[in-house]
């Protein structure tokens, strides 16, 4: 995750802003600079290589002291920054909006995946600039539309029906901020369209998850799609979701947290996110993740008959 201010800076032209991507040498210069505390939140002028991000975001970049940040010296950083600018420059951002826009925290890996989709000549985003820009504006939180299958970050499709598409995420192969844990495995489920879904299509998805992904929890980050993650990683997801939720509220980015369909979401996660939305502390919310929940009556009678026992998955074992 990183703020948009880690990728680009605003340049005032008439009554709105044009966004310009940072170059790696300007960032490198900022990372070595000594800057007064009062100037930590201001864009840094490297003198030689142009404007650089505010020094307060130093930890967002990979250095010899911090291996958890972005690999900003890669060509992928340039592609992601350019794509963000392309999307922001397609809309009008005024002086009253610019601080809010740049403070938004975005998924670096999501944006890299959109670059990969753009470069794939078989993908619809390769052929439609309008859909590409729409996908980016959704990814950076500027659009109120949810991420549907057409505008999704992408990956490898492992399941699809008339209402849902399930993707295996490919973060292990990334350049900008790769997942280093070789045991990482995670999925995302997007809606094919943002409209009411029939019970039969929900039932098909739940049957698939129950039989093929029984070692995983279905959660949501509140953005209109589902994530299918290992139970061992749920606490980590909870920390990130809570931090992003609080940060957005603090910066005035009052984004509605979408709890999604309670029949699909893991019970404990639904309790966690509901508690978070009520304003409870992280400690109180996280207790709900490890609490034994009363099993609700199965909304879909006879669901287990939809699959034969030899189809039960070994994924995640």
Curated annotation (Swiss-Prot):
Annotated region described as RNA-binding, given as residue ranges: 205-241
UniProt record similarity statement: Belongs to the rotavirus NSP2 family.
InterPro entries: Rota_NS35_C, Rota_NS35_N, Rotavirus_NSP2, Rotavirus_NSP2_C, Rotavirus_NSP2_N
Compartments where located: Host cytoplasm
Designated name of the protein: Non-structural protein 2
Subunit record text: Homooctamer. Interacts with VP1; this interaction is weak. Interacts with NSP5; this interaction leads to up-regulation of NSP5 phosphorylation and formation of viral factories. Interacts with host DCP1A, DCP1B, DDX6, EDC4 and EIF2S1/eIF2-alpha; these interactions are probably part of the sequestration of some host SGs and PBs proteins in viral factories.
EC number annotated for this UniProt entry: 3.6.4.-
GO BP: any one term: viral genome replication
A GO term, aspect molecular function: ATP binding
Signal sequence coordinates: none
Catalytic machinery residues: 225 (for ntpase and rtpase activities)
Pfam families (UniProt xref): Rota_NS35_C (PF02509), Rota_NS35_N (PF21067)
Keyword Repeat: no
HAMAP family: ROTA_NSP2
Cofactor needs: Mg(2+)
Gene source species: Rotavirus A (strain RVA/SA11-Both/G3P5B[2])
Annotated transmembrane regions: none
Superkingdom, taxonomy of origin: Viruses
């Amino acid at each position: 995750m990183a703020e948009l201010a880690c990728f680009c800076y605003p340049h005032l032209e008439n009554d709105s802003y044009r966004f310009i991507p940072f170059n790696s040498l300007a960032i490198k210069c900022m990372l070595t600079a000594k800057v007064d505390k009062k100037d930590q939140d201001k864009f840094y002028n490297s003198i030689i290589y142009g404007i650089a991000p505010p020094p307060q975001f130093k930890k967002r970049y990979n250095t010899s002291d911090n291996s958890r940040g972005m690999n900003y010296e890669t060509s992928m950083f340039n592609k992601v920054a350019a794509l963000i600018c392309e999307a922001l420059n397609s809309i009008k951002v005024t002086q009253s909006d610019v601080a809010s826009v740049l403070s938004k925290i975005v998924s670096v890996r999501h944006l890299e995946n959109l670059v990969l989709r753009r470069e794939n000549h078989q993908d619809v985003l390769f052929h439609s600039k309008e859909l590409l820009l729409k996908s980016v504006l959704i990814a950076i939180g500027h659009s109120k539309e949810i991420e549907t299958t057409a505008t999704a970050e992408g990956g490898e499709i492992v399941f699809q029906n008339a209402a849902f598409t399930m993707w295996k995420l490919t973060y292990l192969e990334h350049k900008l901020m790769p997942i280093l844990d070789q045991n990482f495995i995670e999925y995302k489920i997007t809606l094919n369209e943002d409209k009411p879904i029939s019970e039969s299509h929900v039932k098909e998805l739940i049957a698939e998850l129950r039989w093929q992904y029984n070692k995983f929890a279905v959660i949501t980050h509140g953005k209109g799609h589902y994530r299918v993650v290992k139970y061992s990683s749920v606490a980590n997801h909870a920390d990130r979701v809570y931090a992003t939720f609080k940060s957005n509220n603090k910066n005035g980015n009052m984004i509605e947290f979408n709890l999604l369909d309670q029949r699909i979401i893991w019970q404990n996660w639904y309790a966690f996110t509901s508690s978070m939305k009520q304003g409870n502390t992280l400690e109180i919310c996280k207790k709900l993740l490890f609490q034994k929940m009363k099993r609700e009556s199965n909304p879909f009678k006879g669901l287990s008959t939809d699959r034969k026992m030899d189809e039960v998955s070994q994924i995640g074992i």
